[in-house]
A protein has these predicted regions:
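A conserved non-catalytic segment of reverse transcriptases
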Residues: 74, 144-145, 149-216, 220-222
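Short, solvent-exposed helix-loop connector elements
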Residues: 85-88, 183, 199-213, 224-236, ...
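Conserved polymerase palm-domain catalytic core
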Residues: 3-169
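C-terminal, active-site-flanking charged/polar segments
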Residues: 136, 146, 165-170, 243-254, ...
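A glycine-rich phosphate-binding loop feature that marks nucleotide/adenosyl-phosphate handling sites
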Residues: 159-167, 216-220, 237-245, 260-269
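Hydrophobic/basic alpha-helical segments
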Residues: 196-212, 242, 294, 299-302, ...
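Amphipathic alpha-helical core segments of compact helical bundles
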Residues: 74, 101, 105, 109, ...
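Extended C-terminal regions of large enzymes
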Residues: 247, 256-313
Length: 313
């Protein structure tokens, strides 16, 4: 059986997303400052079954296994209680789908290797690193033709040739530090999505207490930190920590609602009466109030104890 490309990451032992990001960083550090960023339109929904089975037949001799895979691909989808036949695509979230994607896209990998290109692919996320914009445009043109051959469609809106520092890959982007050293950071889009998720988790609903909000929030942030620990921008993590705690303080103020309740709770937690009175006098301005002297009544230590550990630690 022909070996899978070394540039293929994801759903393979010892080839995680972090490994793919590190390899991409190395290519940019070597001077390949432009990237051909390919986005395949609804990839898992558009995989051609006959095309995929033809590739599998070259690797698998057992016809019984091939028949099972064909049945897996053609299994109907339950939509509003009705089974819809599937004529293309692989089951979303299915355990075999990522592996089948790697097999289908291996042809793309081999062609890029044959041409000597520096590239990284993680499932259907493909980045090719080149030295000039013109080289990137040529690669983009050839890849469009290759994907048409595989009956796949390039998303022209999202695919582009751009500077590597202006692109993102698997949630990370790159920046140039002193000495022209390439560093990793969390892509702005990933930070935006994270903040949207934090807002969802900290919405006041069903009368949840601050402690009840913090439990799922802490789990989410722990997972987020575990993935993005590869970033080389500790200041960004510190800023996010401050924003999260600002958000939690605002949520708690909103929970107290009325000025009298707010004043009583703040004083009970150690805030000087004059400061508590100023906050309570503007009881409807939760976000602004939560940036004041509230760190006395609701210190960072409280959120640590509630399970919202800091990203910057």
């Amino acid at each position: 059986m022909e070996a899978v490309s070394d540039a293929s990451y994801g759903f393979r032992p010892g080839r995680r997303a972090h490994d793919a990001v590190l390899r991409a960083q190395a290519y940019v550090q070597e001077g390949r400052r432009f990237v051909v960023d390919i986005d395949l339109e609804k990839f898992f929904d558009r995989v051609n079954h006959d095309m995929l089975m033809g590739r599998l037949a070259k690797r698998i001799a057992d016809r019984r296994v091939l028949r099972l895979i064909r049945r897996y691909l053609e299994a109907g989808v339950l939509v509003h209680g009705v089974v819809i036949e599937r004529h293309e695509g692989t089951p979303q979230g299915g355990p075999l789908s990522p592996l089948l994607a790697n097999i289908l896209l291996d042809e793309v990998d081999k062609e890029l290797e044959r041409r000597g290109h520096a590239f990284v692919r993680y499932a259907d996320d493909l980045n090719v690193y080149v030295r000039t914009q013109r080289s990137g445009e040529r690669v983009m043109t050839s890849l469009r033709k290759l994907f048409v051959k595989l009956k796949l469609r390039v998303n022209e809106t999202k695919s582009k040739v751009t500077r590597a520092t202006a692109s993102k890959f698997l949630g990370f982007s790159f920046w140039v530090a002193s000495g022209r050293t390439i560093r990793r950071r969390v892509a702005p889009q990933a930070i935006k999505r994270m903040k949207e998720r934090v807002r969802e988790l900290t919405r006041r609903s069903a009368g949840r207490s601050l402690a009840q909000m913090c439990r799922p929030l802490g789990r989410y942030l722990a997972g987020w930190k575990a993935y993005f620990r590869l970033a080389e921008t500790p200041g960004v993590f510190a800023d996010i920590d401050a924003w999260v705690r600002h958000r939690l303080r605002a949520v708690q103020l909103k929970h107290w609602k009325r000025g009298k309740v707010m004043y009583r709770e703040l004083v009970a937690r150690g805030m000087p009466p004059d400061a508590a009175r100023r906050v309570a006098a503007n009881s409807r301005r939760w976000w602004r109030n939560s940036a004041m002297a509230l760190h006395i009544a609701l210190p960072n230590r409280l959120f640590d104890e509630l399970g919202v550990n800091r990203l910057a630690c």
